[in-house]
């Protein structure tokens, strides 16, 4: 067991609760101690929801430990069924229920006798899966449950929709810009003449899940959520899926061409090449921007990218292919799917890092000293400590990355948003310099030490004065190089002589 003050992916029950609370009229009951029920507050705050989060905690307390949980859990399920009249109640296991070895499946069977709606136990092992894996499994489980139920009752609709149609799978609550991406993907499908059959799980009714096989294909924009469901629908209903994330000009075009291929294989003749060219040349500003002098100023600049598989891979490709930025390190915290990530990014970056240890990532950033970081909320904190600008491109995120305005990452409008984010993340060198020359609020000394270790070196007055003469936008680098040189040579104090020797050593 490892004590962590920062987790990139939360525990399994958070993933299950994200899926349950994304659906319409589905209630989740969490069998957990006080403290595990922070999901309600987190979702209400971050998503700015007007409605209460449909999650109830069945608290494990001393009475439960003494007498067992069955009576309490069953009563809570039946009570909520009567009060809320949900279509489905999902009972969510937690690490506590696993430790207590509660027979939750038996509780569900018992509660189903008295409940009017459906009751389902989320089939996730709390010690084997994290938030993302649990969300993927829970969505698959709910879809499978309702499709099999409809099949038994012979209520499955026969045949496909008259016009080409799509299911968009994987849009959920607390996802990174998910609502904006969903709107952009719907607009993209409309432009292509494709009807949206269902969007799951966000805002979907479980009663409509039986309509999923009517679509011509499934679109899975995020690798972390929805892939298992899409694979199940392909196996059971011969429903093809597209799992190319339409992020960036190149990948959006590739995604549209794949959709074209799938639709044409089903007896229709569509050609989207003119649409792709028109969007790339005239609608999306990203292709034009990448040829402008502004973007050429970024050519060869060093960047570090870190996030979930989908976003980290997509941003790495955009930076390297479309903007000419040098990605020194690309990393992901999705260790369970590391092979896919390596395959996607290895040709676009110097180094690949697969880790969920924020200290390791922080140290790598301090070592590389990139011009900009593209990562999660944690990398933003690291960037602030090292005075390196950071653009947030993946969850986990805080409130400022749940924007009120329209900011998709997918589709052609997404390419514009990403181009803005990238350009605005790089510090323009003269900005710091001018602030120091003419005075301003931003004259703080650059924090230049590594993330994990405090500096053990002293600077004498002359050396400190000389350092302060160095322009702000390179001062951090000069300080780090000098301290590195001093440590290697065994100096405990940095004087002017040491500083000049360090300068000669690095050939500056």
Swiss-Prot record:
It comes from the Bacteria. Component of the dark-operative protochlorophyllide reductase (DPOR) that uses Mg-ATP and reduced ferredoxin to reduce ring D of protochlorophyllide (Pchlide) to form chlorophyllide a (Chlide). This reaction is light-independent. The NB-protein (ChlN-ChlB) is the catalytic component of the complex. Its EC number is 1.3.7.7. This is Light-independent protochlorophyllide reductase subunit B. Binds 1 [4Fe-4S] cluster per heterodimer. The cluster is bound at the heterodimer interface by residues from both subunits. One of its GO terms (molecular function) is 4 iron, 4 sulfur cluster binding. Belongs to the ChlB/BchB/BchZ family.
